[in-house]
Amino acid sequence: VLCGAIPVYVNPEVDQRLGISLGMQREQVAKAIKEHPKAVAVLVNNPTYYGICSDLRAIVKMAHEAGMMCLVDEAHGTHFYFGGGLPVSAMEAGADMASVSMHKSGGSLTQSSLLLTGPDVHAGYVRQIINLTQTTSGSYLLMSSLDISRRNLAQRGRQIFHQVADMAEYAREEINAIGGYYAFGKELVNGNSVFDFDITKLSVHTLDIGLAGIEVYDILRDEYDIQIEFGDIGNILAYLSIGDRAQEVERLVSALAEIRRRFQTDGSGLLSQEYIDPQVVTSPQEAFYADKCSLPLRETEGKVCSEFVMCYPPGIPILAPGERITAEILDYIEYAKAKGCNMTGPEDPDILRLNVLTGRE
């Protein structure tokens, strides 16, 4: 929206059972690069919230051979720099820049992150650009937490994340033994759209017990005082990191077993698909600043959206400015709202109305 870039989406493969998007397929990235030779960069989200990793080395190589930069959203990959047996980190793969959310798995305070730059990126120029979009009066509290966390990981990171990985693997085995749940892991790896998997991520598919992920999330919080990372349409994610202990994992496993016994249903009426291919009509910047009007949600079908709509977490847009609103998207929004998902982005916080472009179909 701010810079006027026009995105070219490389739609990921979708796991039909889990209903989640996977990584970027090499051939699809190569196709997009070939069809858009004037593009300046390839942006990769690696790993995904669920722990899915793309073939980052290959994607970086393709981007560089085409004269493009490779930028990596590595928000959930802080620990890749410190753990043996974990997927390759963005910098190790040769990426030009990577944003790393230290507060997610590194132990720093919420909102604190690092922007890593490669040898071909001018750090001074990057700093100038950052100063255009954020405060020049940085929080020393946040910066101190970053430095303390960095020191802790530099000294003990490998040991810490080895323990985290062991806890996650143990939890997967125990949860899968309950029946009805599927805590997925490295068995998803196929060498392409799932090139690797972050074994510290404890993602659990819940639809086979007849409950949406967000419903299990709510039950864990309200009935068992267990706060996990998030629940979506068909899965939950328990984010294990440096502050977790084995007894907390045991509590989670026991609670999931009891939830299955107490709340299992036949699952009728549940949606399973999490990702909907976007239909881009115009650039995000043009759509965001264009003339617009507000319409009741169901009257927006076929119109071009001028705002973001997303479930948060994980914060992946269901709609972005410039994308066409379809019946499938509207069904998804209404279903997610009914199940209790936290929806953000639109001007109307209740999402009873959406802003759409005037005069554009």
What are these regions (language model features)?
Residues 149-172, 248:
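Structural signature of PLP-dependent enzymes
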Residues 5, 65-68, 95:
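A short helix->loop->beta-strand "cap" motif at the edges of active sites that frequently abuts
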Residues 18-79:
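Active-site phosphate-binding strand-loop segment of PLP-dependent enzymes
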Residues 170, 176-345:
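Conserved C-terminal alpha-helix-loop-beta "cap" of PLP-dependent enzymes
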Residues 89-128, 134-145:
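Active-site PLP attachment segment
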Residues 7, 70-71, 228:
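Hydrophobic beta-strand scaffold residues
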Residues 1-7:
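Substrate-binding/gating loop at the entrance of the active-site cleft, primarily
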